[in-house]
């Protein structure tokens, strides 16, 4: 099983190999989730020629750490940098960074800080509105201390293709601030009626997966 050493211990990740993949998604799950929750998503992406790698956040799945304390956002961004480095070394094809919920906040923070370089594209799902105000989400334990945020929305690399997917009925992260942020950031925005926070585990999951895979395919073909 693949692991890498982070500053906080050994972190596990999972890979679903795809022969002659055109792109790879490096997924940062949400709070309380791990790579084992994403077999169905991996299958859907794989059918479209996109390979999935997913991280077990510290304290989740097979990764070391405390399950109730995933870390500050700064620590999570450091973990993401190590994971993306592993993906880049093993993939040899364009890498799309993706995050769900806390993972979306981590992806945005890591891009803002330059820790993960510039991926081929970015997909965020269930994005916490707090991160769009420059505040770490509450699910990042202890995030208020030494998080390094300036109170401004995270900056995206110029020209980075971005897809934002969000459920209309998301009660954890209301859609309106995310829709407005996507508009001002020049991101492509997809919303899903009768869907909540965890789009990849709801009845709309097949549609969401197809939309993500299709967007990646078009983005890669236009490179």
Language model region names:
Residues 1-20:
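N-terminal cap/lid segment of alpha/beta-hydrolase-fold proteins
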Residues 37, 42-65:
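Conserved alpha/beta-hydrolase
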Residues 92-139:
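Primarily recognizes the serine-hydrolase "nucleophile elbow" in alpha/beta-hydrolase
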Residues 158, 164-166, 170:
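Short beta-strand/loop motif that positions the catalytic acidic residue
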Residues 194-223:
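Catalytic active-site module of serine/aspartate enzymes centered on a nucleophile-bearing elbow/loop
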């Amino acid at each position: 099983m693949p692991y890498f050493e982070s500053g906080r211990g050994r972190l596990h990740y999972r890979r679903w190999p795809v022969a002659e993949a055109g792109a790879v998604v490096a997924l940062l799950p949400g709070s309380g989730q791990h790579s084992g929750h994403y077999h169905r998503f991996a299958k859907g992406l794989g059918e479209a020629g996109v390979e999935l790698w997913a991280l077990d956040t510290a304290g989740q799945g097979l990764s070391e750490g405390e399950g109730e304390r995933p870390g500050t956002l700064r620590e999570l961004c450091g973990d993401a940098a190590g994971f993306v480095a592993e993906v880049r070394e093993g993939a040899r094809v364009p890498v799309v960074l993706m995050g769900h919920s806390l993972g979306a906040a981590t992806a945005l923070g890591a891009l803002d800080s330059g820790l993960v370089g510039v991926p081929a594209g970015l997909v965020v799902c269930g994005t916490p509105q707090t991160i769009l105000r420059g505040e770490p989400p509450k699910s990042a334990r202890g995030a208020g201390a030494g998080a390094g945020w300036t109170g401004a929305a995270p900056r995206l690399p110029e020209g980075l293709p971005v897809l934002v997917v969000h459920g209309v009925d998301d009660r954890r992260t209301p859609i309106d601030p995310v829709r407005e942020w996507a508009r001002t950031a020049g991101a492509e925005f997809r919303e899903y009626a009768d869907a909540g926070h965890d789009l990849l585990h709801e009845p709309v999951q097949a549609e969401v997966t197809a939309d993500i895979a299709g967007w990646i395919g078009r983005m890669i073909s236009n490179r």
